[in-house]
Amino acid sequence: MNKKNQWIVGINAVVSSIENDAEHVCEVLVEAGSKNSRLLDIEENARRKGIEVRRVTTQALDGVGGGVRHQGVAARYAAVRLWEEHDLKDLVDAAGGQALLLVLDGVQDPHNLGACLRSAAAAGVTAVIIPKDKSVGINATVRKTSSGAADRLPVIAVVNLARSLRELQKQDVWIYGLEGEAETSLYALDLRGKVALVLGGEADGLRRLTREHCDVLARIPMPGEVESLNVSVAAGVTLFEAVRQRTLV
């Protein structure tokens, strides 16, 4: 994996980074002249943890935010970020028999990806896998929406998703794809052990090759009149069903 500095913007994202991963926060920028109590708390907390804090202009924050609403604060984050495809095998091996992977096939809305990553971090996933093509990458909007999870999770962008699924199967990882028309219920699956949960993009769902490489296709039962869930909601439901099963005594 490679190291690269990144900027995180927005109150929640910066707070989360300082509280959960302070050693990788290099500096915090706070809007000069602001009396916002939440910004003052961030400044105090950062200084208490030995993080450099600078008061800067709104224009400076606009520059590092890349057009994302920064709410008067940004943090420069110098952590290990760029995971490579070849890291995936080691991550699965390190998780032993409890690897839990989230695979997102073509999620293009950065808010959806950010929300998925936030749920994935809360569920303790081993890694998140996304395709390099036809998918939004990790950008400032994703970081903000994920409340910092995008910079703490191994997120691996792969060239060939079908090939990556085959490699996971060689490591005895079960591949479960979520599809609305599937006959099997999510709640009938055994999600313990080595598992990859695969969800499709907002428009087209799972691509054909992705679907064909799943061991089982399942659906989330919905007794109401709505036919589908937002991908980030579906990811949360699916991940925490896995968490529930894994934590049953």
UniProtKB/Swiss-Prot annotation:
It catalyses: guanosine(2251) in 23S rRNA + S-adenosyl-L-methionine = 2'-O-methylguanosine(2251) in 23S rRNA + S-adenosyl-L-homocysteine + H(+). The keyword Cell inner membrane does not apply. GO terms for cellular component: cytosol. It is found in: Cytoplasm. Its EC number is 2.1.1.185. SMART domains: SpoU_sub_bind. Transmembrane segments: none annotated. S-adenosyl-L-methionine binds at residues 200, 220, 229. One of its GO terms (molecular function) is RNA binding. The keyword rRNA processing applies. InterPro entries: 23S_rRNA_MeTrfase_RlmB, Alpha/beta_knot_MTases, Ribosomal_eL30-like_sf, rRNA_MeTrfase_TrmH, SpoU_MeTrfase, SpoU_subst-bd, tRNA_m1G_MTases_N. It comes from the Bacteria. Specifically methylates the ribose of guanosine 2251 in 23S rRNA. This is 23S rRNA (guanosine-2'-O-)-methyltransferase RlmB. The lineage of its organism: Bacteria, Pseudomonadati, Pseudomonadota, Gammaproteobacteria, Lysobacterales.
